[in-house]
Amino acid sequence: MPRLLTPQTPVHFIGVGGIGMSALAKILVDRGHPVSGSDPRDNPTVQHLESRGVTVFKEQTAECIQSVLATNQQPPVVVISTAIPDTNPELENARAHQLAIWHRSDLLAALIDQQASIAVAGSHGKTTTSTLITTLLIEAGEDPTAVIGGVVPCLGSNGHSGQGRLLVAEADESDGSLVKFRPSLGVITNLELDHTDHYDGLDDLISTLQRFGGGCERLIANYDDPILQEHFEPTAWWSNKQSENIAFAALPLQLDGDRCTARFYENGSAVGDFTLPMAGLHNLSNATAALAACRMEGIPFEALVEGLAQLQAPGRRFDLRGTWEGRHIVDDYAHHPSEVRATLTMAQLMVSSGRSPLPSPPQRLVAVFQPHRFSRTQQFFEAFAEALQNCDALLLAPVYAAGEQTIPGVCSNALAQRIRSLRPDLEIEVAENLNQLTDLVKQRSRPDDLVLAMGAGTVNSLWGRLTE
């Protein structure tokens, strides 16, 4: 496989509307490549790509490849993701024509190889940390290329072809393909078993991330994560618990429902204080990683402090969609028990402290959760039951299959029953579908409630359903 693309090389993405694929497509368009793709979804991402001149076929058929071959003087490179099965007719036809077929990680690896780069890996916080790094670099006067798994607020996009020396990329561990990356600087936020459809167990995940770390010129990692502390020897550590013998530390001074104030240390010496306009210790950890990465790249701390004031979380990370009949509707991507726990803890702090980024102080927390994948729900059943108790009312949607077959006994009703056994006083309702879920939100929530919709599936449509 060639490691570089010439500007004239056409590139065709099968499934171009996905968050990872669309980011790469946007960058290649900006760099002058003829770009096409296919996607049956007519979502805002696809519409944006079409407005940028990308030809998007609405069906994934063999004829798509025929059309791309007919309209380009050179044969295209065909890009796929792990979600594309071998039986996809486009992919089969591309193979029949002996076209170059790259996994999206191959294309990202090629971009990483072309310039100095920062790649962010880890089980949780990748999108937020890579978004914060991108934002801090931009606010410091840099213009990085960015390939992120969410929309970066200051860019309004998940993909950006910058003119600066750095590339910032989110390194997804879900399929193990991040071992292909050779960044100038690697970041590992934390490690916890997930994606058990790919990994045999925690040791397999650790081994994969060790291979990623071994491919980085320099590596920074979270000292507060016990798995990282035991199994990794990075170039530098960061911490939110101690500053002694730690390269970068941010020790919290005050935690509120709408911000964190912390003191930043380098090699044990206090450098200065900063305020992060985001709540939660998990976000302070993400911001500390971002500060550490930028300092490793030589960005002055003073410039970073100014940039911190402009930080916003990426899309679907505690994303205030709006206020509906007095209820604050927030969307969050949390779909692992640790993410659910951290998000609910942050939301409860907003309720208890009376301080939040919401238009008015919330009085109650109504959690709306859509479990993602039957296998994940089964594996972390008890952990989900423990995490989801931390609210004033809980509304559950059916499990979002994400292409999986159902598993007998694994369902939202079973999860609700287990949560009731742990906390009998908690008001819990289970919806049969998203329409009924929307009705339950209308019936069970009150004005001044914080309605927090969590999940990686279709629960993010709640705001649109309420306002249609």
From Swiss-Prot:
Span of the signal peptide: none
Broad class of where this protein is predominantly found: cytoplasm
Pfam families: Mur_ligase, Mur_ligase_C, Mur_ligase_M
Disulfide bonds: none
Catalytic activity: UDP-N-acetyl-alpha-D-muramate + L-alanine + ATP = UDP-N-acetyl-alpha-D-muramoyl-L-alanine + ADP + phosphate + H(+)
UniProt keyword Cell wall biogenesis/degradation present: yes
Record EC number: 6.3.2.8
Record keywords: ATP-binding, Cell cycle, Cell division, Cell shape, Cell wall biogenesis/degradation, Cytoplasm, Ligase, Nucleotide-binding, Peptidoglycan synthesis
Keyword Hydrolase: no
Binding site for ATP: G122, S123, H124, G125, K126, T127, T128
GO biological process, one term: cell wall organization
Single GO term (MF): UDP-N-acetylmuramate-L-alanine ligase activity
Compartment(s) of residence: Cytoplasm
A single cellular component GO annotation: cytoplasm
Function text: Cell wall formation.
Family per record: Belongs to the MurCDEF family.
NCBIfam families on file: murC
This protein's name: UDP-N-acetylmuramate--L-alanine ligase
Organism: Synechococcus sp. (strain CC9902)
